Amino acid sequence: MEPQREFFHIAGRSAKEYLSENLVQFIQATQNYFNIGEKFRDPYVAPSAGVTTDRSQKLQLRVVPMQIEDNANYYKARFTLNVGDNRLVDLGSSYFDIKGTLDRGPSFKPYGGTAYNPLAPKSAPVNSPFIVGNDTHVVAQLPQTYAAANTGVTEAIQQQVSNVQPNPQDGLPNYSGPEVVDATTKAGLGRVVAEESEGQQFPCLRAYAAPQTAAGDVSTAPIEKTYVNTTNVAGRVSGTMATDVIDWQNPDAHFVDYVDDGRSTSAGNRPNYIGFRDNFIGIMYYNSGSNTGSLSSQTQQLNVVLDLNDRNSELSYQYMLADLTSRWHYFALWNQAVDSYDRHVRIIENDGYEEGPPNLSFPIQGIQNPFSPSSVGTEMTVNTANQTAAATANTVAHIGYGNIPAVEMNLPANLRRTFLYANVAMYLPDTYKFTPPNIDLPANHLSYGYMNGRLPLPNIIDTWTDIGARWSLDVMDTVNPFNHHRNTGLKYRSQLLGNGRHCNFHIQVPQKFFAIKNLLLLPGTYNYEWYFRKDPNMVLQSTLGNDLREDGAQITYNQVNLYVSFFPMNYDTQSELELMLRNATNDQNFSDYLGAVNNLYQIPAGSNTVVVNIPDRSWGAFRGWSFTRLKVTETPRIGATQDPNFEYSGTIPYLDGTFYLSHTFQRCSIQWDSSVPWPGNDRLLVPNWFEIKDPPNQDPEGYNTMQSNLTKDFFFTQMAASYNQGYQGFSYPSCTKHYGFINNFEPMSRQVPVYDATHPNLMAAYLNNPATMPIWNNCGFQQKTSTNALLERCGHAYVANWPFPLTGRDALPNQTTEKKFLVDNYLWQIPFSSNFLNMGTLTDLGQNVMYANSSHSLNMQFTVDPMNEPTYLLLLFGVFDQVVVNQPTRSGISVAYLRLPFASGSAAT
């Protein structure tokens, strides 16, 4: 029997559909005290979640390119898009399906530390020979022993060695404890690396040799024996070693100190995740030049894509996505794992470490004399009457005297110090680093080899730096915090590609250009092509921002297909919709999400002012300004498929929104060619002049806010621009925004001594000349601070002389409070709207008549913190960036672009 289909519909039947009207009214009247509606539910209801409805059904087809062009700089794919009758194409859900191969280059290292002998001491050698002068020194540990009487030559000859025997993992039996081997009656057995081995000899930590067979042997030549004698007996053999000829390798490490082959120290290469950029930024080429993408009908061949160099296609997509959904979820779609950083690295909350009972290390056996094996003897039988003692037969005694020997280390302090060294010190500006002696680094400062080999000065950051404070290192405030191995978004995107240098990729890339990504395309035949960059610095992102082109990364596209979604409709429905959309009154209208014209104004190194002049123009429909600061080295020429001067692969704030220099602005003035003040006289400060932050330790009028040096005036301006909260700015915003102001505003303060002749600034003296080592702290328990912090400790225990105490009974009385703030991921905003405080007489545009109906020139002047490298002022002018799309005939499409007040244009086919 066929089931009654009416009981199996998707949504479930409503009681109103089949109950009598009187019963429905009764249920509604009594439901507040007795809900009887549940009594009338259908016994069979299909699920309403996890099912496919007619609203979600689409037909997705693959379109293969008709023409491709593959050269050194880009890959171009041209598609013929046929939209048949009874079909509508949703270009908003279309995407490019790309297959290819990726060589992430030798600088790719997706982990910290090393994979090879990570438990070995930093300077410990492997069993190997090394040359000192004219002598060959053999350094080896021989853990296996055998009986060897007299000269031991016969026994040594009898020892059987092979490619894998003796195994370097074998040694003394379990539970044997520390044993002093008598080399006159016993001999040792082990393995040693041959002097003839190829490659650079390396410490045991991070040393590697490739296996030759499945047995694990590493020798590339037949095994020979090496004999040694460490006794005073002439002609004796006290050790036998199997000699391996190997190919020395150190895949993930480098030298940090080198004297000779037997005296060197290694460190693991720095982590360097490499993956596609967030939302595949940079892979698709957006520009108004000859290499722009195109969408045209086959009848007239006129491109309807009008992109401009001052449009923000990539950044608009970032902002749109952030407002549509959470940037911290759904990472698998479109590769949109957002760039982030560890706030505890950017802003160090140095609350010290947690103390407890001492951390002690004990001998494995537990019973031992201090730094020597337990004493060996026998049990004794004591005659109390005669007061004599004699050895008890068949007994052995192993005795340690005194307390169990132990060594102590402050494990929490060491863990804290390791965190600060690996996460902060290693990312210091290059000015605060040095090249270890006898270490050769590449001349190119942008290469991974150079960045990897430089070491930080020890005293810049330590466990006592700004202790007790929440403060960012001043020298780190202008360092890109997103270029860090704790960027979880980049790490995720790198891991999506796997953990190997060479990988295959299969990715889906969305269209971001605002006129195409929303378009509903009517029946016809169209040409659609786009350019895909191959420059690894633009397409890929790395942790350290090294020059991936220089370091050998390569991208190869093997296949680019287009997937488009067709709405399956019946003939009548499709025909009706098509007729409506063909009508000019039903044009499709789209806005660029960010709606801004961007301009870059160069700020030379050391300069603290930048002036912007805009000639006469009408300012109708103008919405205001957004601005921040970018480094020249981190900003590519987006008008080129490959910028040869762009030698950097970290985040690109210009495209991805990872702004981090907004805190470097001091003030901004805005002047029109008119005496009418703007934006009015009811602001805290002088009209037309915005003070963003006060100089350090200066706030005579009390304008600062939230324990920082940000002014109340500019705080209110940002609250008005971001959340429509002007003088009500001291209230919680109604929403959170990934790129919002208060979400990213980080105030901080600290106390510091007032330095004078009595209280000298030892840190300044150290930075002036590290060789003087003026700071005494942890003396004897670490390497001296004029050299490499990774070497063994030296010196002796002594009193500390730094930092000055700021708390407790001995607190320095003469202290001053320093305040500052950071506001990353954010563009400063100054709105130009009647809603912003007072704009005078309003028009229907909501703006002052003077600016809406006549032309005026504009002068803006910014005062910024000077930096030691050239930067840009990124200034966004808020415009209405619109496109109107009309498809009057089959295969006919016309597009009109409107950008007020800055530009307009049109394209039609």
UniProtKB/Swiss-Prot annotation:
Listed InterPro entries: Adenovirus_Pll_hexon_C (IPR016108), Adenovirus_Pll_hexon_N (IPR016107), Adenovirus_Pll_hexon_sub2 (IPR044942), Adenovirus_Pll_hexon_sub3 (IPR016110), ADV_hexon (IPR037542), VP_dsDNA_II (IPR016112)
Q: Which residues carry this modification: Phosphotyrosine?
A: 897
The recorded induction information for this protein reads: Expressed in the late phase of the viral replicative cycle.
GO terms for biological process, alphabetical: microtubule-dependent intracellular transport of viral material towards nucleus; symbiont entry into host cell
| Stretches of the chain forming a coiled coil according to its record | none
Q: Where is this site: Involved in interaction with pre-protein VI?
A: 726
Q: Which UniProt keywords apply?
A: Capsid protein, Cytoplasmic inwards viral transport, Host nucleus, Host-virus interaction, Late protein, Microtubular inwards viral transport, Phosphoprotein, T=25 icosahedral capsid protein, Virion, Virus entry into host cell
Q: What is its main location?
A: virion
Compartments annotated for it: namely: Virion; Host nucleus
Q: Cite a GO CC annotation.
A: T=25 icosahedral viral capsid
Q: Which GO terms describe its molecular function?
A: structural molecule activity
Say yes or no: keyword Phosphoprotein present.
yes
Give the note: All late proteins expressed from the major late promoter are produced by alternative splicing and alternative polyadenylation of the same gene giving rise to non-overlapping ORFs. A leader sequence is present in the N-terminus of all these mRNAs and is recognized by the viral shutoff protein to provide expression although conventional translation via ribosome scanning from the cap has been shut off in the host cell.
Subunit details for this protein?
Answer: Homotrimer. Interacts with the capsid vertex protein; this interaction binds the peripentonal hexons to the neighboring penton base. Interacts with the hexon-linking protein; this interaction tethers the hexons surrounding the penton to those situated in the central plate of the facet. Interacts with the hexon-interlacing protein; this interaction lashes the hexons together. Interacts with host dyneins DYNC1LI1 and DYNC1I2; this interaction might be involved in intracellular microtubule-dependent transport of incoming viral capsid.
Family assignment? Belongs to the adenoviridae hexon protein family.
Classification via HAMAP family: ADV_CAPSH
**Purpose of the protein:** Major capsid protein that self-associates to form 240 hexon trimers, each in the shape of a hexagon, building most of the pseudo T=25 capsid. Assembled into trimeric units with the help of the chaperone shutoff protein. Transported by pre-protein VI to the nucleus where it associates with other structural proteins to form an empty capsid. Might be involved, through its interaction with host dyneins, in the intracellular microtubule-dependent transport of incoming viral capsid to the nucleus.
Its name, as the record gives it, is Hexon protein
**What organism is this sequence from?**
Snake adenovirus serotype 1
